[in-house]
């Protein structure tokens, strides 16, 4: 509410400097996509980040709502991996498109035959709706969850996969992961 020539006026922008109004509206536009993907690790008792690091994959499952997000990733795509509430833990390149976890192989050995820290990734493996799915990843640089990297204001959300656009986060990640 403003007093303008003796009248009380309710306004938001019209008394502001018009250049400031333009700058505010431009700041709400999305930044262009960087070409890097944000991915969520989901180390939560179903899947293990240590297994993902060791055997070269990223997993999602528990329903097609979650696993279908992996369809966005193609061979050659660069990804940054994030663990909820902890920070960024990895940078890698997609080497294999989505496949059911029970069919994923590491050097011709089925994933389910390897010593896993979290066997629960095998849950519902005969149910295509609920099973875990993976994409192959050549991890270029990773950190244990206890050493996850973050800063105040770093981009993070609950999506399994999404386009990474935030300039400050990208700068931080490129430096941290030597990209």
Q: Model-found features: residue ranges?
A:
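Short beta-strand-centered aromatic/proline hotspots
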Residues: 88-98
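Short, flexible loop/turn elements at secondary-structure junctions
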Residues: 43, 83, 96-98, 141
